């Protein structure tokens, strides 16, 4: 009776979900050093390499994938998780002449 309007609103809100338009994020092999020491993954506090910047903290790739399986929002800060990652090309050997 009166619940049909709420069901219609629920279906309309689900169909108008915005698509993911997050900007590409740079993968950091090692986080930038700061005044307060090394940066670690804010979720597991173990990983300190291959970190991705999420709003105001870093996440390792394992924790990022785990969070993306559950939803597109970060469990720590509530912001949208990065889904596009740019991997920088780093030389595997020293440049000639160095």
Swiss-Prot record:
Main location: virion
GO BP: any one term: viral budding from plasma membrane
Intracellular or extracellular location(s): Virion; Host cytoplasm, Host perinuclear region; Host cell membrane
Gene Ontology terms, MF aspect: RNA binding; zinc ion binding
One Pfam family named in its UniProt record: zf-P11
Region (Disordered): 1-26
A cellular-component GO term for this protein: membrane
Compositionally biased tracts (Polar residues): 11-23
SUPFAM superfamilies noted in UniProt: RING/U-box
Motif (PTAP/PSAP motif) on chain: 91-94
Keywords: Host cell membrane, Host cytoplasm, Host membrane, Host-virus interaction, Lipoprotein, Membrane, Metal-binding, Myristate, Viral budding, Viral budding via the host ESCRT complexes, Viral release from host cell, Virion, Zinc, Zinc-finger
InterPro entries: RING_finger_Z_arenaviridae (IPR024183), Z_RING-type_Znf_sf (IPR038485), Z_RING_Znf (IPR003224)
Residues with lipid group (N-myristoyl glycine): 2
Zn-finger segments (RING-type): 41-77
PTM description: Myristoylation is required for the role of RING finger protein Z in assembly and budding.
Note on domains (UniProt): Late-budding domains (L domains) are short sequence motifs essential for viral particle budding. They recruit proteins of the host ESCRT machinery (Endosomal Sorting Complex Required for Transport) or ESCRT-associated proteins.
Function text: Plays a crucial role in virion assembly and budding. Expressed late in the virus life cycle, it acts as an inhibitor of viral transcription and RNA synthesis by interacting with the viral polymerase L. Presumably recruits the NP encapsidated genome to cellular membranes at budding sites via direct interaction with NP. Plays critical roles in the final steps of viral release by interacting with host TSG101, a member of the vacuolar protein-sorting pathway and using other cellular host proteins involved in vesicle formation pathway.
Subunit structure: Interacts with protein NP; this interaction probably directs the encapsidated genome to budding sites. Interacts (via RING domain) with polymerase L; this interaction inhibits viral transcription and replication, Z partially blocks the product exit tunnel for the releasing nascent RNA product. Interacts with the glycoprotein complex; this interaction plays a role in virion budding. Interacts with host eIF4E; this interaction results in eIF4E reduced affinity for its substrate, the 5'-m7 G cap structure.
Record family assignment: Belongs to the arenaviridae Z protein family.
Name of the protein in question: RING finger protein Z
Origin species: Chapare mammarenavirus (isolate Human/Bolivia/810419/2003)
């Amino acid at each position: 009776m009166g619940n049909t309007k709420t069901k219609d609103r629920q279906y309309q809100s689900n169909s108008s979900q915005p698509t993911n338009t997050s900007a590409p994020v740079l993968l950091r092999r090692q986080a930038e050093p700061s005044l307060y020491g090394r940066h670690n993954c804010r979720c597991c506090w173990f990983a300190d390499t291959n970190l991705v910047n999420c709003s105001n903290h870093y996440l390792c790739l394992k924790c990022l994938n785990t969070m993306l399986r559950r939803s597109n929002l970060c469990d720590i800060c509530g912001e949208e998780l990065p889904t596009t990652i740019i991997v920088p090309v780093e030389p595997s050997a020293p440049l000639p002449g160095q």
